[in-house]
Amino acid sequence: MNAAPPPEQPLKPANRRRTTLLLRMGLLMGGALAATLAATWIYFHPSAQRQRGVCYGSRDGVSLCLDIATPKEANGLGIVFIVSGGWKSSHDRGHEWLTAPFLRRGYTVFSVFHLSQPRATVAEIFGDVSRAIRFIGNRAEEYGVDPDRLGVIGGSAGGHLSLLLATQGGPEPAADGTSIKSRVRAAVVFCPVTDLTDLTGSTEDPGDGGPPRNFRAAFDQRPVDIDRWRETARELSPLHHVTSDLPPTLIFHGDRDTLVPISQSERFRDAAVTAGCDVELVVIRGAGHTWLTMPLQVIQAARWFDAQL
C-alpha cells in the first residue's frame, strides 16, 4: 500500500517575500512592455486624411498611382516617398510606418509607386517618378504644399531614384501637359546606388564591367551589350550628374552592406563636397543593407527636413 504524500510545506517568510517581489517585478515589466508597444503603435499610426490610388499617369496600359497623407495640422510642405526596392514597387512593401515621423511634424506625404521592373526599365521608371514630381507640383495648391519646397526620401532603389531626382530633376518638356520642374529641394536616402559604372564590392558585380547580374532585364540588357551598357550606366548614375546645384542631401548607409557597398555613398559624398554641395553621410556601424534601428534614422531625417525645407 502506497504511503500518503507528505503535506506541502508553507513558504518561509523570506521566500514568500522574494516570490512576491518577483511577481510584482514581472507584472511591472510586462505592463511597461505593453505600454511601450502601445505607444509605439500609436506613434507610427498618426491620424491623417488619406487619398489612395491617385493616378499621375500610365505606362503600358497600367495606371501609375500615388497615395497622399495629409496631417490635421499641415505645415504646407511636402515629402515625396519613392516606394521602391530592387526597382519594384507595390503597396505591400510595408512603407506606411516610414511616413509617421513626417506626418507628426506636419508634412504632407506623397507615396509614389511605379511600374516594377522588368515590365518597365529603370530609365522608364526614373521618367515616371519625375512625372510624379511634376504632377504634385502642378497641383500643389490643391494639395496645400509649396511646389518649390518638396523633399524626397527613398532607400536602396528608392534612394537611387531619389538621387536621380536630386541631380537631374529640372524644367521638363510639357509633353504630359505640365511645365513644372521635377527637381526637389532636399533629399534623404538610405543605402543608395550612386554609380552603376563601378559596382566593385557588390554581390551584384558581374566582374566584367557589365550590368548588375540579377538586374539585366531592368536595364534592358538582355543580351548584354557592354558599349550600350556603359552609356546607360553613366546616364543613370547620380554620381556622374553631381553639380553645384545639388540640393542638400542626407545619406544613411551601413558599413557592412554587401549588396550596395558603402563606397557607393562615400564616392557620391566626396564628389558632392568637391562641387561645394551640402552632403552628409551617416555611417551605421555593423549594419548591412537594412538594420533594426532604421526607424530612429527616419525620425532623424524628419528633423533634418525641418532645417532644409
Language model features with spans:
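N-terminal cap/lid segment of alpha/beta-hydrolase-fold proteins
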Residues: L37-E73
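Catalytic nucleophile-loop/oxyanion-hole region of alpha/beta-hydrolase
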Residues: C55-Y56, S90-D92, L98, F110-P147, ...
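Mobile cap/lid helix-loop segments that gate and shape the active-site cleft of serine hydrolases
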Residues: R59, D198-H241
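Short beta-strand element of the alpha/beta-hydrolase
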Residues: N75-G86
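Primarily recognizes the serine-hydrolase "nucleophile elbow" in alpha/beta-hydrolase
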Residues: R134-E204
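Short beta-strand/loop motif that positions the catalytic acidic residue
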Residues: D245, I251-H253, D257
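Conserved alpha/beta-hydrolase "acid-adjacent" motif
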Residues: T258-R267
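Catalytic active-site module of serine/aspartate enzymes centered on a nucleophile-bearing elbow/loop
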Residues: P295-L309
